[in-house]
Amino acid sequence: MITYEEYVKQLKELDVYSTVAFKRVVPYVLIQQQQNEDELLLRLRAPSEKLVGEINNGSNKLVIIDLKISYSHVYQEPQLSIQLWETNGRQENQEEEQVDEIYLWYPNNINETLAIPTNLFTIELDTVPRPRVERTTTDNINNSGSKKLMSSSAWYVVHSCDTSEIVGTPIQNYLQRWASVYIASWWGIVRTPNNC
């Protein structure tokens, strides 16, 4: 376990790309990184040779993977959430340059799709709250004053149970060790799914 305060401190220092395992599998391109006090979102694009492969009648491909690191107050552990985005490769306007549409993709078996060993940890589809932009009375949308509105979206969530047993209990570099296990250990092995 790690306290929220220690988690926030280590999150500021976390460099997922510095883990040894991640350095070996650099084929994924970081296209966006957002960080606030207690969350880190990495949006990665898979290069063409690492695409999961053809799915849904041979036309769709995985193109973007979002990894969100947050804190589970219930388990007092870091939590990894995953979203997959696919493209259908369809041209919207044949006369102009090709524009791919991208969609959230929820494969039947996330472990198989991302080649994550099922004995490593449990992954389940769940809704994850996300804060929306604060609105004030000047927005003419929310007349009740300044409120932080919440919405939620579906993510694959890696269950936080047994994290201390997997990562080890020393607090020093806890989050870096966690990232090595929960992200870098499986990240380099994306393959074609058999059952989507």
Curated annotation (Swiss-Prot):
Subcellular location: Preautophagosomal structure membrane
Active-site residues from the entry: C161
Superkingdom of source: Eukaryota
Broad enzyme group: transferase
The protein's Enzyme Commission number: 2.3.2.-
Chief place of localization: membrane
One function term, GO molecular function aspect: ubiquitin-like protein transferase activity
Name by which UniProt lists this protein: Ubiquitin-like-conjugating enzyme ATG10
Organism: Vanderwaltozyma polyspora (strain ATCC 22028 / DSM 70294 / BCRC 21397 / CBS 2163 / NBRC 10782 / NRRL Y-8283 / UCD 57-17)
Upper lineage: Eukaryota, Fungi, Dikarya, Ascomycota, Saccharomycotina
